[in-house]
């Protein structure tokens, strides 16, 4: 279709009345502003069965506001209520890819994949945020993420029309899907096909970097090129193709297993994968599941595993899974131990010889600190688990086969510590992966087993599988 004819369609209007229901006086979200509701309406219109450039819905199913909100909550693993709550709004406010999660995103007919393995790309223009060399390096590295696991080859063109045309632009930039200024929508790409098919556009109102500051161009480009090759968004929060941007750290990037499965379904495997071990997202109901750390946080329970955590809330019917860095970008990908200090409204996170103090989702100034500040000798290299007792002001730390007890009032370790875990808590084994306390019971986790230990009787009263904590 000629672009001029396509532009004429933009004058068509979508006359259906479409708005979020305003909560009544009994709802918990009375404090949400009109701006919040407007943001939510824009979000759902953009990412859940969006209009095509003609102003017409591509699909008729799930086009009511409540249906779209339910679909969005289901996509992100939130409690499906059809109501705009704080958790849903938090997701909507995170920076993300501009490609819809449900519904097509294209101007011209798309195809499932490219019919060839040798593809070309061209960098049409550059962002002023990085040198030309840095931009070229980021894009080359992003394409390599996909060529490493498939037979695909990518060749750069310096003029003419390539299969994948890459450009930076702002607001209205010629494809009828405008950018929105800083943050929010970061970039978008079109699926394989003619004309715009395969093209990737980056919002130049963002600050593009090669680090954790601003938005990392390599990570965003690798995601967008996944769309250019035919992949849709993934519901897996650990996948590169998850729609929300998360800086994953400075270490060598390895494509997650979910993305490998998706791209190899389209193009098949490559001859030799330089990274044969691709990270998988943990399954909460895996009978062999072990945990890294557990802590409460303002009435919720946070359960850490690898680079993820599950969030448990008494009012939810299922555990919600998130990347740790999507909430705390400055923390390490993996943590060793965690505990809450309710009277200070703080949680403490441990990794190796360092620990962080957090107020909600904000890291306190002056952190991380060394665990030696708490009184640990130099031969203690990590804390494997920790639990705080608000009534006594004591905190138990587990490291190797030993347990330490810290006095919060005197800010020092208690005398006669450390002790052997087996002596203080007989029956739970000689190591602790994670621990928490509730209603007079301590719950010790050791591999796939958890022990319910009575503080009053000093004995194990129940043995359960670890995954029962996650309602499995």
From Swiss-Prot:
Region labeled Interaction with collagen — which residues? 269-472
Disulfide bonds listed in the record:
285-472
List positions binding Ca(2+) 3: 180-181, 183, 185, 203, 206
- Its EC number is 3.4.24.-
One GO molecular-function annotation for this sequence?
A: metalloendopeptidase activity
Where are the glycosylation sites? 118, 153, 159
Where would I look for the motif Cysteine switch in this sequence?
Answer: 95-102
Going by the UniProt record, its keywords in alphabetical order are: Calcium, Collagen degradation, Disulfide bond, Extracellular matrix, Glycoprotein, Hydrolase, Metal-binding, Metalloprotease, Phosphoprotein, Protease, Repeat, Secreted, Signal, Zinc, Zymogen
Coiled-coil region(s): none
What are the binding positions for Ca(2+) 1 in this chain?
129, 204, 206
* Record: residues binding Zn(2+) 1: 173, 175, 188, 201
Which GO CC terms are listed, alphabetically? extracellular matrix; extracellular space
Signal sequence bounds: 1-19
Tell me which residues bind Ca(2+) 4. 292, 336, 384, 433
Phosphotyrosine, modified sites: 367
**What does the UniProt PTM comment say about this protein?**
The proenzyme is activated by removal of the propeptide; this cleavage can be effected by other matrix metalloproteinases, such as MMP2, MMP3 and MMP14 and may involve several cleavage steps. Cleavage can also be autocatalytic, after partial maturation by another protease or after treatment with 4-aminophenylmercuric acetate (APMA) (in vitro).
Q: Which InterPro entries match?
A: Hemopexin-like_dom, Hemopexin-like_dom_sf, Hemopexin-like_repeat, Hemopexin_CS, M10A_MMP, MetalloPept_cat_dom_sf, Pept_M10_metallopeptidase, Pept_M10A
**Where is Ca(2+) 5 annotated to bind?**
294, 338, 386, 435
The record's region (Interaction with TIMP2) falls at: 177-247
Tissue range of expression? Seems to be specific to breast carcinomas.
Matches recorded under PANTHER family: COLLAGENASE 3, MATRIX METALLOPROTEINASE
Entry note about domains:
The C-terminal region binds to collagen.
Q: Of which family is this protein a member?
A: Belongs to the peptidase M10A family.
Name of protein: Collagenase 3
| Species annotation | Equus caballus (Horse)
Give the organism's phylogenetic lineage: Eukaryota, Metazoa, Chordata, Craniata, Vertebrata
Gene transcribed to yield this protein? MMP13
